[in-house]
Design a protein with these regions (language model features):
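N-terminal amphipathic, basic-rich helices that act as targeting or association modules
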Residues: 1-81, 238-262, 269-273
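Gly-rich Lys/Arg/Thr-decorated short loops/hinges at beta-loop-alpha junctions or inter-strand turns
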Residues: 2-8, 30-34, 96-109, 136, ...
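Acidic active-site catalytic centers that drive phospho-/nucleotidyl reactions
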Residues: 11-14, 144, 172
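Cofactor-binding active-site loop characterized by glycine-rich and histidine/acidic residues
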Residues: 41-162
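Active-site flanking residues adjacent to catalytic metal/cofactor-binding acidic residues
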Residues: 68, 143, 170-171, 274
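Residue-level preference for the first positions of well-ordered beta-strands
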Residues: 137-139, 165-167, 271-273
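A short alpha/beta connector and helix-capping loop motif
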Residues: 149-171, 181, 185-194
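Long, well-ordered, tryptophan-enriched scaffold segments
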Residues: 174-273
């Protein structure tokens, strides 16, 4: 079993990408069997398996910080950081906590339990890294339900002013935010996250700016046209209007695609929401 090869953090990086669906199924089977005996949060964890796997594949713990809002969906995170054997005593006295707990593992960056706090904590970590000079990535995972909390929007407002990488993952389980569908949206999402698109956009801008007189005007009009199209086609413009780059939407059960998106997100010099 692939799951038996996961003994500590970052072991998932050794798993071939084509084997990720197998590992995801093994994790779900383990959760179903284990939680049927101990109880615990089942549905939220079954829905976040691939998301967690992709984050652990792209980022390096405990150096990088993953902050889970509420934290009840962190069971796969605990499994991938070497705590699988502790599930036999999950949520029992002296046993494994049902939420992230810093004293339990250095891979738990923040003690959670209440909702809408993860983005604020992430902003704090980013600011702390700037003060200390430490280099690490910060990821805040928040659900659409928790995003309704006012504290989350205050944090988004503060995050927009950061000039350092900060990844916010919106885990939309369709309980509060309507699903986005359509080939145009998927196409634009793929296009915007491709390095070739980013490079081409930069070259076109440089070339047009060299045109005497009308060059800068053409660049400005192209930007306005592009933004108008994005407003119609891409749901994340709300975040972009706040100054936070948006990448998505992404199928939360497509581990390979999420790995690709997170690899692009960690290169952004500033806040980015997936």
């Amino acid at each position: 079993m692939l799951l038996e090869t996961i003994e500590k953090e970052n072991d998932i990086k050794k798993i071939p990408l084509e084997q990720m669906p197998v590992l995801a199924q093994e994790i779900r089977d383990f959760l179903l069997e284990s939680l049927s005996k101990t109880g615990g949060h089942l549905a939220s964890n079954l829905g976040a398996v691939e998301l967690t796997m992709a984050l652990h594949y792209v980022f390096s713990l405990p150096k990088d910080k993953i902050i889970w809002d509420v934290g009840h969906q962190s069971y796969t995170h605990k499994i991938l950081t070497g705590r699988k054997d502790g599930f036999k005593n999950l949520r029992q006295y002296g046993g494994l906590s049902g939420f992230p707990k810093r004293e339990e593992s250095p891979c738990d960056a923040y003690d959670t339990g209440h909702s809408s706090t993860s983005i604020s904590a992430g902003v704090g970590y980013v600011c702390a890294s700037k003060v200390s000079g430490e280099e690490y990535h910060v990821v805040s995972v928040i659900g659409d339900g928790a995003l309704t909390g006012g504290m989350a929007y205050e944090a988004l407002n503060n995050a927009a002013s950061l000039n350092k990488n900060f990844v916010i993952v919106l885990n939309d389980n369709k309980m509060s935010i309507s699903e986005n569908v359509g080939g145009i949206s998927s196409y634009l999402s793929n296009l915007r996250t491709a390095e070739s698109y980013t490079d081409l956009k930069s070259e076109v801008k440089k070339t047009l700016n060299k045109v005497p007189g009308i060059g800068p005007v053409m660049v400005q009009r192209i930007h306005k046209t592009k933004d108008s199209i994005k407003q119609l086609m891409i749901p994340g413009m709300f975040f972009e209007d706040m100054g936070i780059k948006y990448l998505g939407p992404v199928n939360g059960h497509d581990c390979g695609r999420m790995i690709q998106i997170f690899q692009e997100a960690k290169k952004v010099n500033g806040p980015v929401l997936v």
